[in-house]
A protein has these predicted regions:
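Outer membrane beta-barrel transmembrane domains
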Residues: 64-69, 81-83, 89-117
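Repeated loop/turn-to-beta-strand initiation elements of outer-membrane beta-barrel proteins
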Residues: 54-63, 85-93, 122-130
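N-terminal targeting leaders of membrane proteins
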Residues: 17-40, 53
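Transmembrane beta-strands of outer-membrane beta-barrel pores
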Residues: 37-43, 51-55, 67-73, 82-84, ...
Length: 156
């Protein structure tokens, strides 16, 4: 008798457990704004704005797309970001296109560069970036075919 009561109870409880494991509706990607101030080579001071598209419900990672306007150039970048912890720390790896203006640091004026950049935020959105870019526009007679972009950043 006990076995049959146990089996009946088990058949009643099991569907409830299975219902709790049923896949729910897929959430759409979560988007949030991204803004920051950068200082460094070649654009000097610049203001960046863009969007973060969080693709995972369990981790804070996804796609980042940014546009940056600076004193001596403009940049567009897109790539992958990953936030770590709760204090605004994380990193991003991006493909970047940069167009310099009149007097950039360590770069040719009025020249287009393309390459990769890595951004690392230590805490509270404060961090650094490094990148390697190569000239894609018409060659001029100077030594700036390759460009190392370096700088510090404060972002939200």
């Amino acid at each position: 008798m006990r076995r049959s009561v146990f089996l009946v109870g088990l058949f009643i409880v099991l569907p409830m457990c299975a219902r709790g494991q049923r896949a729910g509706e897929e959430k759409t990607p979560n988007t949030s704004p991204a803004v920051g101030v950068h200082y460094g080579s070649p654009m000097r001071i610049s203001l960046a704005g863009g969007v973060l598209v969080d693709m995972s419900a369990h981790r804070n990672d996804g796609v980042v797309a940014m546009a940056e306007a600076g004193q001596q150039g403009n940049e567009l970048s897109v790539g992958y970001f990953r936030m770590l912890g709760r204090f605004g720390s994380g990193y991003s790896l991006r493909a970047a296109a940069l167009r310099t203006a009149g007097e950039p640091w360590n770069a040719s004026p009025n020249t287009t560069y393309a390459g990769i950049e890595a951004h690392w935020m230590i805490a509270f959105g404060v961090g650094a970036r490094v990148g390697y870019l190569r000239r894609t526009s018409k060659r001029v007679d100077d030594a700036h075919d390759n460009l190392a972009s370096i700088g510090i950043l404060v972002g939200l």
